[in-house]
Regions:
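Non-transmembrane amphipathic alpha-helical segments
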Residues: 54, 58-72, 88, 92-95
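Long, non-catalytic architectural segments outside compact domain cores
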Residues: 1-49, 53, 103-134
Length: 134
């Protein structure tokens, strides 16, 4: 980090094309897909480890999609990032369909696709740990 970038003063480095990327679960834990943007504010803390559940895996995929979308907003000509975005979009779509078929709908609009309205049925998505209800 440049010496002119004080920790209490907002500073965001310019992203270069094809920046390094965290793995999806590590990105979710650190709050950014890009290690170059993982800057300290006062004290640097390492990302916490999240439990490995189907829901956190889906959340990690969705987080990476959001981060890549923001990156592509400022780098629309980065073909490698766009290819990666399309790959993650397909992975997220498949993971969401698999999750909802096993555990039930994640959104109210998904509850409309079943045989009957199933939004308020327990267990809730956050009550699952490693495919079992806690």
């Amino acid at each position: 980090m440049p010496s002119c970038a004080g920790l209490a003063v907002p500073y965001v480095p310019f992203q270069q094309d094809a920046p390094k990327k965290y793995a999806q679960s590590e990105a979710l834990s650190n709050g950014t897909l890009f290690p170059g943007l993982n800057l300290p504010f006062h004290l640097k803390t390492e990302g916490s480890s999240l439990p490995s559940t189907p829901l956190t895996e889906l959340q990690a995929l969705e987080f990476v999609l959001l981060e890549l979308g923001i990156y592509l907003d400022t780098h629309p000509d980065d073909a490698e990032a766009f290819t990666l975005f399309k790959q993650y979009a397909a992975m997220e779509k498949a993971a969401k369909a698999a999750y909802e078929s096993k555990f039930g709908p994640l959104t109210k609009s998904a509850a409309a696709s079943g045989e009957r309205y199933s939004w308020l049925q327990e267990p809730w998505p956050w009550n699952y740990e490693q495919n079992e209800v806690k």
